[in-house]
């Protein structure tokens, strides 16, 4: 069907949406005293403060000295110390934020007239204890969706989806269950979720993660609906669950409280429609609205590199209408929206508030959890994104460790291993971070100074060199150009395809503070005789194994005229369309190398494995 084919829409020349102009948002703050009020935008030195207020420097230094804080003329006063000084010397004070290209994303404000607002669908996150049925509930809800059935039930995982209840009203679900994702978004200031559905197994009751989920939802002041799951089991005891939740002020309406409880089963789909109706009831009470007729803004919930599209992001629109051709800034990335599709794979021309869509057109991979804003000027958008990148680098170059850890480092009680990870997906990144938290080596710690989705770049190598960090790549190949830069800068890049092995290597390094030495042991070589291309797997090389053997999953190098062009892994190995584990010399086989786009007839695929070189004792 044509609706599933990518289309590049023309921008509507009669676009009447309210524009977002960066220049109109900019604000300068003039530090000084006006009408008895000292206005400032941030920390000042003692000398600067005295100059702006005409207070003698001796008086300021004496004031803080008597309070146990010795200062000099060049000492920097924090915003709290400035407030203290103002109160002591008879000034009112006011802290104002100066808005520039550097901080406009986090400080931009939209003053929409209430008459411009219209109801929007609620955005819901499922939370609860592991094994209580969060994922099963999401699947059950998805299967009730009439919109998906219109397209043959074909859906793709973009991180969020929409469903309709029996009356045709829409709800948006974030398809990343768990409070870790919820809290991670909030840590970046992203209040995406409107309603939390707390899943509790009726046969198991409250667990630690249930309590954590409640704390996170209450901290965000997000309404909670309780879904008591697994009611199809004979051991289910909903009254027990209700009593346990009472101490968290989650009391059902029939018990005199104001929390909605729904009893059901994700397995049998009992209670699903009641849950959807309850969500819409809360949404009606909370009155979620947005301005539809404005340049769009919202948040990214998933980012990745998608074959054929490049850097993509799944975003949820919170304000305005996003359209093809819009100029978007998303964290360090910017670009014009090139394609837009929903969870059913349908290519769209626009997305309205609460709508989740996957969009492409970015210059680099964005950052999940960051805010996106549509601007009317391409130059401003590019400058804002570049400023974000500069700030990231500054943060990365400042190792942020808690004070206790700093003291231990200074006293040489502890050593810190700086790490940089570049991976294939957000899921891999989360798994790596969890693996790092589980490493426990007395006297040692790991510090992830940078991590991201996408191939290793020259910037990653320069950061590794400047910080003395170890640089790791997971499930991604490595171009020869980047490898040459790393070699030139004296930076070692480790490519891994298994998280447990990566974690084991880092743990061994921590234990001995010695990097293991590996050597490449050749297994075999295959010559590329012909090429095919498949939309799902990329380039397929028809080869003849010339020496040794080729193994599926093995590391490999692509050689052209004896020069290494690419390093990766044998993702697929087939003999006459049948998957095989290995092929010996003299045999023909089809080979797919992960991430390799530049492959030619007569190239040589060198297959090898790494073996640790034992140190001489």
From Swiss-Prot:
Region (G2): 153-157
Region (G3): 175-178
One Pfam family linked to the record: GTP_EFTU
GO cellular component, one term: cytosol
Domain of life: Bacteria
Basic residues bias: start-end ranges: 1-11
Region (Disordered): 1-25
MF term (GO), any: GTPase activity
Occurrences of domain tr-type G (ranges): 119-288
Chain spans, region G1: 128-135
Binding-site positions, GTP: 128-135, 175-179, 229-232
Localization (cell): Cytoplasm
Region G5: start-end pairs: 265-267
Function recorded in the entry: One of the essential components for the initiation of protein synthesis. Protects formylmethionyl-tRNA from spontaneous hydrolysis and promotes its binding to the 30S ribosomal subunits. Also involved in the hydrolysis of GTP during the formation of the 70S ribosomal complex.
Natural source organism: Mycoplasma pneumoniae (strain ATCC 29342 / M129 / Subtype 1)
SUPFAM superfamilies xref list: Initiation factor IF2/eIF5b, domain 3, P-loop containing nucleoside triphosphate hydrolases, Translation proteins
UniProt name for this protein: Translation initiation factor IF-2
PANTHER family (UniProt xref): TR-TYPE G DOMAIN-CONTAINING PROTEIN, TRANSLATION INITIATION FACTOR IF-2-RELATED
Family: Belongs to the TRAFAC class translation factor GTPase superfamily. Classic translation factor GTPase family. IF-2 subfamily.
Keyword annotations of the record: Cytoplasm, GTP-binding, Initiation factor, Nucleotide-binding, Protein biosynthesis
Keyword Protein biosynthesis assigned: yes
Keyword Protein biosynthesis: yes
CDD domains, A to Z: IF2_eIF5B (cd01887), IF2_mtIF2_II (cd03702), mtIF2_IVc (cd03692)
Region described as G4: spans on this chain: 229-232
């Amino acid at each position: 069907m044509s609706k599933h084919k990518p289309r590049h829409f023309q921008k509507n020349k009669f676009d009447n949406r309210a524009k977002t102009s960066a220049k109109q948002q900019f604000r300068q703050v003039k530090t000084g005293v006006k009408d008895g009020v000292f206005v400032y935008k941030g920390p000042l030195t003692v000398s600067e403060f005295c100059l702006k207020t005409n207070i003698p420097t001796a008086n300021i230094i004496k004031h803080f000295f008597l309070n146990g804080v010795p200062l000099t003329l060049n000492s920097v006063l924090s915003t709290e110390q400035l407030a203290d000084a103002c109160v002591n010397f008879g000034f009112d004070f006011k802290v104002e934020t100066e808005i520039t290209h550097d901080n406009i994303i986090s400080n931009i404000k939209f003053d929409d007239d209430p008459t411009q607002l219209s109801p929007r669908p609620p955005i819901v996150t499922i939370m609860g204890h592991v094994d209580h049925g969060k994922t099963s509930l999401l699947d059950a809800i998805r299967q009730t969706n009439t919109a998906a059935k219109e397209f043959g039930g074909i859906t793709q995982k973009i991180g969020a989806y929409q469903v309709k209840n029996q009356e045709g009203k829409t709800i948006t679900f974030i398809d990343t269950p768990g409070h870790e994702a919820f809290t991670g978004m909030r840590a970046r200031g992203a209040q995406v979720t409107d309603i939390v559905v707390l899943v509790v197994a009726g046969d198991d009751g409250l667990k630690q993660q249930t309590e954590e989920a409640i704390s996170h939802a209450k901290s965000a002041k997000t309404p909670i609906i309780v879904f008591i799951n697994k009611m199809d089991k004979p051991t289910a005891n909903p009254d027990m669950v209700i009593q346990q939740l009472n101490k968290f002020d989650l009391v059902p309406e029939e018990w005199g409280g104001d929390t909605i409880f729904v009893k059901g089963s994700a397995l049998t789909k009992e209670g699903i429609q009641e849950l959807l109706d309850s969500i819409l009831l809360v949404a009606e009470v909370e009155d979620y609205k947005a301005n539809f007729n404005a340049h769009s803004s919202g948040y990214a919930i998933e980012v990745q590199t998608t074959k054929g599209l490049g850097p993509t992001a799944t975003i949820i629109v919170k304000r305005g209408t996003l359209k093809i051709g819009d100029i978007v800034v998303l964290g360090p990335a910017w670009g014009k929206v090139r394609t837009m599709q929903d969870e059913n794979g349908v290519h769209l021309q626009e997305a309205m508030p609460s709508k989740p869509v996957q969009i492409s057109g970015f210059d680099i991979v964005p950052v999940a959890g960051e805010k996106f804003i549509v601007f009317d000027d391409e130059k401003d958008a590019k400058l804002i994104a570049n400023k974000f990148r500069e700030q990231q680098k500054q943060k990365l170059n400042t190792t942020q460790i808690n004070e206790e850890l700093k003291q231990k480092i200074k006293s040489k009680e502890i050593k810190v291993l700086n790490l940089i990870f570049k991976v294939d997906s957000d899921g891999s990144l989360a798994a790596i971070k969890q693996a790092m938290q589980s490493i426990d080596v007395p006297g040692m710690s790991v510090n992830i100074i940078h991590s991201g989705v996408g191939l290793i770049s020259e910037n990653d190598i320069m950061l590794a060199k400047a910080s003395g960090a170890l640089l790791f790549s997971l499930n991604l190949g490595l171009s020869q150009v980047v490898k040459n830069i790393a070699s030139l800068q004296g930076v070692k890049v480790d490519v891994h395809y298994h998280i447990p092995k990566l974690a084991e290597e880092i743990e061994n390094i921590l234990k001995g503070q010695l990097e293991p030495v590996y050597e490449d042991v050749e297994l075999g070589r295959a010559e590329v005789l012909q090429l095919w291309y498949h939309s799902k797997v990329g380039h397929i090389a028809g080869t003849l194994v010339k020496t040794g053997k080729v193994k599926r999953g093995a590391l490999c190098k692509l050689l052209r005229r004896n020069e290494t062009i690419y390093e990766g892994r044998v993702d697929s190995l087939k003999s006459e369309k049948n998957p095989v584990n290995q092929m010996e010399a003299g045999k023909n086989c089809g080979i797919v190398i992960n991430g390799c786009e530049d492959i030619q007839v007569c190239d040589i695929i060198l297959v090898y494995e790494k073996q640790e070189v034992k140190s001489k004792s």
